[in-house]
Amino acid sequence: MKQQFTPQEMADRCLIIREVQNIVGKVAHCDMLADYDLVYKNFWSTQEDVCLGFNNGYFKGAAAVKGYYDQKLANAKKLTELVMEKWKDHKDVQGKTAAEMFGAGYVKGTDMHTPIVEVAQDMKSAKALWQFQAADTRVTARGPLSVWKIGYMAADLIEEDGQWKIKNLLYALDIDHPCAEPWTEPSKYGPIPEFAAFDIPEPEPTVPAEVYKAYAPRRPYQEPPRMPEPYTTLAETFSYGI
């Protein structure tokens, strides 16, 4: 039987849906600005069993999730330093401090769409799924490069001390490929010796796993992240984490 809600319950649920979309949107915005120091402390639950997932595995537990954002911030600072060193004679760099130049060599735009949000019947949690398309441009070991990142963001959120916080967050990428090339072919952009210092490694999951397989011409059908569906409590439904 379809769940019936009072006008007040409907209003409360609309506010929760708005909050869920705002929180995950703010996380995406911080990623676009490399403001990684703001993400964990402002938007994640303080519970120990939080989980952050990517195609190649999970960051499981509070320390691992916080460590991911700490490493992303360190990488952004390292990129700034490398850009300042390589182009130290450029007028836009001369006389500037690292703090003033933070974010140099990096720009990202993320478009999130097709939101699906389900609020639990007990109104203590919510599940959400988006598709997204991002253009990630930065100086890399292959030189300055723009990369399409297209896929899904999925999240479990919980109410914690009167505020909504992320418990699990999953990024499932279908496309991770340079913008100027067909997705059906291997990339022709190889390492460039003069940019070798820009080979900055991404954080490695603490629980390696093939969570999701990116598109390739001969990829078998890849089931997308499960769509949120009506549920009673978070304990009684599936999870976007492990």
Feature map (PLM): residue ranges:
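A solvent-exposed, acidic/Ser-Thr-rich amphipathic alpha-helical stretch
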Residues: 36-134
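Short, low-complexity N-terminal intrinsically disordered segments enriched in polar/charged residues
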Residues: 1-45
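Short, cysteine-centered beta-strand-loop-beta hairpins and adjacent loop/turn segments enriched
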Residues: 135-147, 175-177
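Short beta-strand edge/turn micro-motifs at domain boundaries
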Residues: 125-129, 150-184
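Conserved catalytic-core segments centered on acid/base and nucleophilic motifs
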Residues: 28-31, 39, 117, 155-158, ...
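Short, surface-exposed coil-to-beta transition loops
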Residues: 110-112, 147-153
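A hydrophobic membrane-anchoring alpha-helix module
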Residues: 183-242
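Active-site rim elements
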Residues: 26, 55, 142-144
